[in-house]
Structure formats: C-alpha cells, structure tokens
Amino acid sequence: VTAPPLIAPATPADAGEILTVQRAAYLTEAQRYADPFLPPLTETLDEVRAAVAGPQTVLTARLGNRLVGSVRIRVEGDIAHVGRLSVAPDQQGRGIGGRLLRAVEAVVAARVCRFALFTGADSADNLRLYQRHGYRVVGHDSDPNGVRLALLEKPVPLRC
C-alpha cells in the first residue's frame, strides 16, 4: 500500500518541477487535440514562478521527495477558478488529481459560491474526474486555437 501524497502550498523552488509535471501531463491533451500550443505546454518557468508568488493559490502533491502533481485556484468575486490540474503520467488514475482538487477547493470554499473550470470537451477521463467531484458541464467554448472546451461548475454547499 502506497502512502497518500503530501499536499502542500507550492514554493518558488517548486516551479521547475511543477512545469515539468505539467508539460508531461498535458502531452496527451496536445496529442488528442493535435495542438502543441496548449497554454500549459507553452507556459514559461517565469510564468509558473509568478503563479506561485500569488495572488492565486498553487498546491503541490508529493510522494516522498518527488513532486507528482499540482493545481491552481484563483478567486474572482464569488467564483473560484480551478486550473492547471496536473498529475505525472505514471501516477494518473491513483486518486492524486481528486485529492488535489478537494484540497484546493477547501482553501477557498469559505469565500466563494461556486467553483469553475474548463477542460477539453473530448477529454473523457478529465470530465469523469470532475463529474465525480460534483462538477457539471454548463456550456462549451473554444480556445484561441479552436480547441473545443467544456465549461464546468460546482456550487459550494451551504453558501450563497
């Protein structure tokens, strides 16, 4: 039995590992949509460092010394926008993404009415993960490169 990952706030020193895991995790999405320019793949190390510095919250998941996942959340008014949920490909399907999602929601749940995120409309595994955690598709959009996106939301229980 493997111990659960340690979920903790990211530090500036984590930025390189976050970017490495993020790029590895999003490669399958790039292949699925034939788009090597997805924002998680083109983001720079300086941009990841800026994200870690705030005002958004960035959490990491570690198994021992290895960073195996991360997620970000940014609050705008009464909505918390979840983004860049990434898990190392060899660790996917083990509950790490769900743990990161629950942990990042808990950070801001007392301050917002709902969570919002988007994922590729054809990303069945991602959609299943989010739906298992209470998110529902509320619409569709396209990114600047024409990739079709599913927009999902989840109300915060007993708020608003």
Regions found by a protein language model. Name each.
Residues 46-60, 81:
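A short helix-loop-beta-strand connector motif used in the catalytic cores of GNAT acetyltransferases and
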Residues 62, 85-92, 119-121:
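A short, internal acetyl-CoA/4′-phosphopantetheine-binding micro-motif in the GNAT/acyltransferase core
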Residues 130-141:
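Conserved acetyl-CoA-binding loop of GNAT-fold acetyltransferases
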Residues 60, 66-74, 81-86:
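Conserved beta-strand in the GNAT
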Residues 108-119:
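Conserved GNAT acetyl-CoA-binding A-motif
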Residues 6-20:
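A short beta-loop-alpha structural element at the N-terminal edge
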Residues 20-49:
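Conserved GNAT-fold acetyl-CoA-binding loop/helix
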Residues 87, 93-106, 128-132:
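Conserved acetyl-CoA-binding loop-helix of GNAT-fold acetyltransferases
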